[in-house]
A protein has these predicted regions:
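Active-site neighborhoods and metal-handling regions in enzymes and metal-associated proteins
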Residues: 1-522, 531, 540-542
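A short, hydrophobic C-terminal helix/tail in secreted or cell-surface proteins
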Residues: 526-534
Length: 544
């Protein structure tokens, strides 16, 4: 954007932006880039787009927020507030402004429907040692939420004072006069940090910009949240397997399907699951050349017919009261080419190698990226997107602080209780694409090491891979054993749920695709995991 503007304005030109809608971090980047051409970025009070809309501007969501029950949250909101206050005090601050919507939802154990596919509500929270103020549109909180937050007669440190949503900026200017330091959340991966308007409402000498302590606490799931995520993924796998059996059965009967129809029915199967609260993002169903677009979403105009001639990629997920899912699977309903089998097998091997990793706790998150890419690199191919991201619990499907990308400058490390995706892929424009995505849980390893704690991953996505796209001769004995263990878990954990359904088609579909692999000791075609892990360690030490 700054480059485009700079090319159209003469030196000395000025451009305005609404500081309530632009993060402070983005504002500073824009201002710096524009200044290189003597163009100046200025805050404007009246939003031009709002003015153009006039009376025809769509209204905000009128859906009420609702309580997220303690049996899924695992901790009371008062416990969370106490923990955040301790961390804020550790920063030497006596107040914090919370702007990230998923952080507000997590902190207060509430959920909303203000943003499509995200269970959050529009609000701000100002937290001090003795008060909690929530800036929220009128009539947004139903009585159950108000009772939980003790909004009536609020005179203690553990009740919430409700304020007008648009009063936040003026209140901050007033309140900051008595504060010594104010913690303002910094930009971090999928969190934009505070807006420019909030940043400038706090005097310069009182600003303390740092990683949000709520982000840190939220990303390390508690025991209740961990168990909920595991259970949600079992139900999600049940819906997915049952749908795929239904799709293949209908296509065998000659029924016509297109991308949009596949997405519609998969969403329907998910919504029928217990505790489901909708989909976690717009379902991606991409057939043939459309699968070469990583973020393609079908529409009435673009939807292709689905048949047996090419690759079918499905990237989808759901929200449940006890968890959030995100899964990608690639299928071929006909006879795949040798090229398609080769690429799919390489993508799968990357998934397995990453999932098998055991590593010291000090290994930076970014460095595991090479495990997912190594087998593709051997063929001279790569993918441009990151390999993975954090996942919330009935929250944001893209959760900070995890972003797995070897090019990242961030040196954050994994913590027990993180949930994240691994999603290597391949995209050949005009022909086909494929991606495999699983959610993994970070767990403590039982190594008794002099180098401190070791960590490993537990896969919680429980959906079979496409057997006709796997070249078994390329898999190492380790990889085959991992697949056998994985398929055994699918049968034992998802199988009982599929058997409870009115028909057994989903169960038979799952059983068909989880046949065990014969493990030999002569798979020399596969790259040794040890060699790839050595590369990871070299990268972490800056020696490669």
């Amino acid at each position: 954007m700054p480059e485009w503007v700079s090319n159209r304005l003469k030196p000395g030109g000025r451009i305005g932006a609404d500081p309530t809608l632009v993060s402070s971090a983005a504002w500073e980047r824009w201002a710096k880039k524009l200044a290189e051409n003597s163009v100046y970025l200025l805050p404007i009070r009246n939003n031009l787009v709002d003015f153009i809309w006039g009376s025809s501007q769509p209204s905000y969501s009128k859906h009420d927020a609702h309580v997220w029950p303690i049996e899924y949250a695992g901790k009371t909101w008062q416990e969370k507030v106490a923990a955040v206050r301790t961390m804020v005090e550790g920063h030497g601050c006596d107040a914090m402004v919370v702007t990230s919507l998923d952080e507000i939802a997590w902190l207060l154990n509430i959920r909303g429907r203000d943003i499509p596919f995200s269970p959050v509500l529009r609000a701000y929270v100002v937290l001090t040692k003795s008060q909690i103020s929530m800036y929220v549109p009128p009539n947004k909180l139903d009585l159950s939420v108000q009772r939980q937050l003790r909004t009536d007669n609020c005179y203690s440190a553990f009740c919430v004072r409700l304020q007008n949503y648009t009063s936040i900026w003026e209140d901050l200017r007033t309140l900051s006069q008595v504060w010594k330091k104010v913690l303002l959340p910094a930009e971090d991966e999928f969190s934009q940090g505070v807006s420019r308007a909030i940043y400038t409402a706090i005097p310069v000498d009182k600003r303390h910009v740092a990683q949000s302590p709520i982000m840190t606490l939220k990303s390390e799931k508690n025991p209740t949240e961990k168990e909920g995520m595991r259970k949600a993924h079992i139900r999600d796998a049940t819906a997915f397997c049952d749908f795929m059996a239904y799709l293949e059965d209908k296509m065998a009967d000659g029924e016509n399907w297109d991308e949009l129809k596949v997405a519609h029915y998969l969403d329907k199967f998910r919504r029928e699951q217990n505790l489901n609260r909708g989909i976690s993002f717009r379902t991606i169903v991409a057939f043939g050349p459309h699968a070469a677009w990583p973020h393609y979403v079908p529409s009435n105009v673009t939807s292709l017919s689905v048949d047996r001639s090419s690759i079918l990629l499905i990237d989808s997920g759901g929200h449940y009261l006890d968890g959030t899912t995100d899964v990608s699977r690639t299928f071929h309903l006909g006879s795949p080419s040798d090229r398609e089998v080769d690429i799919y097998t390489r993508v799968l091997m990357g998934c397995i190698d990453l999932a098998m990793l055991q590593f010291p706790h000090y290994l930076p998150i970014r460095n595991i990226d090479v495990l997912a890419r190594a087998h593709l690199w051997q063929a001279g191919v790569d993918y441009r997107h990151s390999t993975g991201h954090g996942v919330g619990v009935y929250g944001s499907v893209h959760e900070s602080p995890i972003n797995i990308n070897w090019q990242s400058k961030d040196a954050k490390m994994f913590r027990v209780g993180y949930f994240f995706t691994e999603e290597p892929g391949f995209y050949q424009e005009g022909q086909f694409g494929m991606r495999l995505e699983n959610v993994l849980e970070v767990v403590q390893n039982n190594f008794n090491s002099t180098h401190g704690p070791f960590l490993s991953f537990r896969i919680i996505t429980l959906i079979p891979f496409e057997p006709k796209l796997i070249d078994r001769s390329r898999l190492s004995p380790q990889q085959k054993r991992w697949l056998n263990d994985y398929y055994s878990r699918i049968r034992s954990e998802v199988g009982p749920e599929l058997r409870r359904l009115p028909n057994m088609k989903g169960y038979h579909w799952m059983m068909d695709r989880t046949q065990p692999f014969l493990v030999d000791c002569d798979s020399s075609a596969a790259v040794s995991l040890n060699h790839v892990f050595l590369l990871v360690l070299l990268l972490s030490l800056g020696l490669a």
